[in-house]
């Protein structure tokens, strides 16, 4: 664990091999031309080159690029957001179709300034992608929408392939890590989503390295399973800037492998766990695995 004013040295296993090809450069050019945002870029995701260049998957960030919250782990800009762009859903869908994406993840900044939390634009984005790229699987990754479950229903009625909502950290650290969200509200959000559409897989992820214990990580697993979450992702927290929370521990890949084994033994249909794993990492594979498990249980 890091001492109060100590910065840990980043270990060798966190060095990233950069892959760039026409998929990567084409998608990046398309984003700029269409005034679109991706969480891959805004949140400084370490897997952007693999996802864009190799796997042909991308995570679009809608509802603008400014978040109304200021979570202490997140690199996305915060402040007063711009007005909603009602043409954004069509531009996202056009980009998905043009790039022939296998899997599209749609996330958003938190829009606590909007009565519907942005659910209307979220839902229209899903519908637009369905029209223009019917073979692309769609994962939605909303905020907790302030715990308004009518807004969640608006989104779930579009029947995405996966509903993803991140609990982010263990119960004890939640007030410090994301002060404007609550651990139990995230669990309730996931439970309600499954109740609304029981056949749609649900997913959640946590970052580790913020000072949690192994027992607390396992408690998160149990809490997610108790609320019928199918898929879990576990990744290393990386400090985006000096103003964000410091890394307290860098977990070894072997520790991630052990956590994945525990999660699978407990009953998740899929668990991604590794130093560079993020919420949408290998998301295209998770759709297929969750579908196979549901078919086997039918």
Swiss-Prot record:
Which residues take part in binding [4Fe-4S] cluster 1?
Answer: 40, 45, 51, 280
- Cofactor(s) required, per the database record: [4Fe-4S] cluster
Per the record's keyword annotation, is 4Fe-4S included, yes or no? yes
User: Keywords for this entry?
Assistant: 4Fe-4S, Cytoplasm, Iron, Iron-sulfur, Metal-binding, S-adenosyl-L-methionine, Transferase
**Any one cellular component term from GO for this entry?**
cytoplasm
Q: How does the cofactor attach, per the note?
A: Binds 2 [4Fe-4S] clusters per subunit. One cluster is coordinated with 3 cysteines and an exchangeable S-adenosyl-L-methionine.
Q: Which GO terms describe its molecular function?
A: 4 iron, 4 sulfur cluster binding; lipoate synthase activity; metal ion binding
What residue stretches are annotated with the Radical SAM core domain? 53-269
Which residues does the annotation say bind [4Fe-4S] cluster 2? 67, 71, 74
Q: What class of enzyme is it?
A: transferase
Which SUPFAM superfamilies does the record cross-reference, listed alphabetically?
Radical SAM enzymes
Q: InterPro entries under this entry?
A: Aldolase_TIM, Elp3/MiaA/NifB-like_rSAM, LIAS_N, Lipoyl_synth, rSAM
EC numbers listed for it are 2.8.1.8
Give the reactions, separated by semicolons, that this protein catalyses: [[Fe-S] cluster scaffold protein carrying a second [4Fe-4S](2+) cluster] + N(6)-octanoyl-L-lysyl-[protein] + 2 oxidized [2Fe-2S]-[ferredoxin] + 2 S-adenosyl-L-methionine + 4 H(+) = [[Fe-S] cluster scaffold protein] + N(6)-[(R)-dihydrolipoyl]-L-lysyl-[protein] + 4 Fe(3+) + 2 hydrogen sulfide + 2 5'-deoxyadenosine + 2 L-methionine + 2 reduced [2Fe-2S]-[ferredoxin]
Pathway this chain belongs to: Protein modification; protein lipoylation via endogenous pathway; protein N(6)-(lipoyl)lysine from octanoyl-[acyl-carrier-protein]
What the entry lists under PANTHER family is as follows:
LIPOYL SYNTHASE, LIPOYL SYNTHASE, MITOCHONDRIAL
Q: What's the protein here called?
A: Lipoyl synthase
What gene name is given for the protein in this entry? lipA
